[in-house]
């Protein structure tokens, strides 16, 4: 009986620490992806102007493409 209770407490503790580890790993992954995104949006080699910075992975806005000219 006591052994069963200790086993349950141990499994709860492991699951709590595992969920914390997963959250920490997700935060690190998001940080690295945002860092790479900022690194890759350097100067544009065509006109020498800096590209527009993104505010984050979840808040990207894209401008509409220009309408094709009628010929």
Curated annotation (Swiss-Prot):
Localisation per UniProt entry: Host cytoplasm; Host nucleus membrane; Host rough endoplasmic reticulum membrane; Host cell membrane
GO CC, alphabetical: host cell nuclear membrane; host cell plasma membrane; host cell rough endoplasmic reticulum membrane; membrane
Membrane topology category: Single-pass type II membrane protein
Protein name: Agnoprotein
Predominant place of localization: host cell
Intervals, Cytoplasmic compartment: 1-27
Extracellular side stretches: 45-71
Taxonomic superkingdom: Viruses
Its job: Alters the structure of the nuclear envelope by interacting with host CBX5 and disrupting CBX5 association with LBR. Involved in the perinuclear-nuclear localization of the capsid protein VP1 during virion assembly and maturation. Plays an important role in the release of progeny virions from infected cells and in viral propagation, probably by acting as a viral ionic channel in the host plasma membrane. Allows influx of extracellular calcium ions in the host cell. May contribute to viral genome transcription and translation of viral late proteins.
Post-translational modification: Phosphorylated by host PKC. Phosphorylation alters the stability and may also have an impact on the subcellular location.
Transmembrane segments: 28-44
